[in-house]
């Protein structure tokens, strides 16, 4: 935990909080009336605890402790906090309260209008109003079945991140496609009105973790402990192209096996094998572009990439080489990615009137 910025004294009288509840870790940011972060607290608690335990009581208790400790360490009391705002999986069935998704297209106006305020200690056991930002689901037919499943997708949390993106980077040419890399890869179409038209999601990040932890290929892509930074600095277009070619001609499942052969038979070093597996997954990931037309997403427009540095680099290389699509912005530094969520939450709260006297 630590102080991020100094408070502005008598000029700024009001404080509010942003709760960023992840899968395994959560963060609470305390902001002043000028929307400056003055303190940040973290705790190992997340929605995974609900999934594992079958109850959200541990999550509620952990978030309560984190919230109260962060407020206290910021030199404030709970009565100083006007409200807290949150988004993401905390609004799902394994969070604090399940909040229905908004229909796409939706932008900052729709998200602000859709805020669900709650002050109920059985939901969030702190005596502070909690504002839930709703996720967004694709626009698909009301009578959709599995036959239309390719049109169906949703997000929780990324809508806030994307509003932060268009707020912090107003110069981005509209419309554009944003791609975020985390436990999933998610593609988002942003229209000329800065609305989210919809999303397409793959399980790429979790697939990599499963391969790494649960298959014998994992041994072939593991490097020395603590060498992720060294790997992030390595890039060889020839390796990336070889992986793309393998997926294209031999298929995704066989390409996933190839780092094993590269280790045992070819004696390639671990970082080449790791780059190959990452490029293999991203090559398969790019097949999602085939469904852009189905959802009415523009195909030949600029891309913005957000997330892990190496995945962004591989994706950018393949996107430009094989699809001729330009990447106009990359946001890879963790503090800059975190800032998207903060600025997005602030922008939505401000649009809803919570930063100018709304109770």
Annotated model-derived regions:
Residues 280, 317, 331-359:
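Glycine-rich phosphate-binding/hydrolytic loop that grips phosphoryl groups
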Residues 46-55, 137-245:
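Glycine-rich phosphate-binding loop plus the immediately following alpha-helix
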Residues 19-25, 89, 179-184, 204, ...:
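A short acidic Gly-Thr/Ser loop motif
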């Amino acid at each position: 935990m630590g102080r991020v910025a100094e408070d502005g004294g008598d000029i700024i009288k009001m404080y509010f909080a942003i709760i960023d509840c992840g899968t395994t870790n959560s963060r609470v940011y305390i902001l002043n009336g000028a929307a400056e972060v003055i303190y940040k607290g973290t705790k190992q608690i997340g929605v995974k605890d609900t999934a594992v335990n079958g109850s959200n009581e541990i999550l509620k208790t952990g978030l309560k402790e984190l919230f109260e400790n962060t407020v206290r360490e910021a030199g404030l009391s709970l009565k100083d906090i006007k409200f807290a705002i949150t988004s993401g999986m905390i609004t799902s069935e394994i969070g604090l309260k399940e909040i229905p998704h908004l229909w796409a297209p939706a932008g900052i106006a729709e998200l602000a209008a859709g805020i669900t305020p709650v002050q109920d200690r059985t939901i969030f056991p702190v005596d502070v109003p909690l504002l839930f930002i709703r996720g967004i689901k694709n626009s698909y037919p009301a009578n959709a079945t599995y036959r239309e499943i390719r049109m169906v997708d949703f997000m929780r949390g990324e809508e806030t991140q994307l509003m932060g993106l268009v707020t912090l980077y107003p110069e981005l040419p509209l419309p554009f496609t944003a791609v975020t890399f985390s436990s999933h890869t998610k593609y988002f179409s942003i229209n000329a009105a800065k609305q989210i038209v919809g999303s397409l999601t793959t399980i790429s990040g979790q697939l990599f973790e499963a391969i790494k932890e649960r298959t014998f290929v994992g041994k072939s892509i593991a490097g020395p402990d603590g060498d992720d930074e060294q790997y992030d600095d390595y890039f060889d277009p020839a390796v990336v192209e070889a992986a793309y070619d393998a997926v294209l001609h031999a298929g995704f499942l066989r390409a996933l096996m190839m780092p094993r052969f590269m280790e045992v038979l070819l004696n390639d070093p671990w970082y080449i094998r790791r780059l190959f597996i990452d490029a293999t997954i991203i090559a398969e990931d790019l097949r999602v572009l085939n469904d852009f037309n189905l959802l009415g997403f523009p195909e030949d427009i600029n891309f913005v990439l957000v997330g892990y540095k190496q995945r962004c680099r591989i994706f950018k290389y393949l996107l430009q080489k094989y699809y001729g699509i330009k990447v106009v912005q990359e946001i890879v530094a963790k503090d800059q990615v975190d800032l998207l969520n903060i600025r997005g939450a602030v922008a939505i709260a401000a649009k809803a009137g919570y930063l100018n006297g709304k109770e």
